[in-house]
Regions:
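Kelch-like beta-propeller repeat domains
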Residues: 1-173
Length: 173
């Protein structure tokens, strides 16, 4: 029956892509599906690195283009807190592979879905794998084995913890 099981949703209003990053998070009203970055293979062989982002709201059955640029292709994303998305690593641009390749981006970024602000939180002192999966249990997350340079995969698993932010009312308290 077409009323049960899988259902095709509207396509996002951007280019087709591979190596995209996605997660779910609240936009302040609804739980939405977020799609970021990726690459598009053109017919002439050119590979276009994408840094756009979109939010799909299932209640409204519509996509919204996000304001920021997201240089996180093939990286990892996870929801944290009520309205944040944490980005771990990624590929900001394609660089031809060689022994001298610097490796992929180790930047940790934080996106706020209500204010649509993206900040560079910190740079990890070790390689963050791309083209891999992330698993989360509570505030602990694991980044599985993945690629740290073109064609170089690591057997390492990274473990991280999201430390909840202490909310305060202001200077008085």
């Amino acid at each position: 029956s077409r009323n049960k099981g899988w259902k095709e949703l509207p396509s996002w209003p951007g280019e087709p892509r591979g190596y995209a990053v996605s997660t779910t998070q609240s936009d302040g009203f609804d739980k939405c599906f977020y799609l970021f970055s990726g690459r598009n293979y053109k017919a002439d062989g050119y590979i276009n690195t994408l840094t756009d982002g979109y939010a799909f709201n299932p209640r409204l059955n519509s996509w919204k283009k996000l304001k920021q640029s997201f240089p996180v292709m093939a990286g990892n994303a996870l929801s944290c807190g009520a309205n944040h998305i944490l980005f771990l690593g990624g590929v900001p641009q394609l660089i031809p592979g060689s022994d001298d390749h610097p490796g992929f981006d180790n930047t940790i970024r934080l996106y706020h879905t209500i204010t649509q602000s993206l900040i560079k939180k910190e740079v990890a002192p070790y390689p963050i794998s791309v083209t891999t999966n992330i698993a989360q249990k509570g505030n602990t997350f694991y980044v599985g084995s993945g690629e740290v340079k073109p064609g170089i995969r690591t057997p390492h698993v990274l473990k991280g913890e999201i430390i909840p932010f202490e909310k305060k009312l202001g200077i008085v308290n």
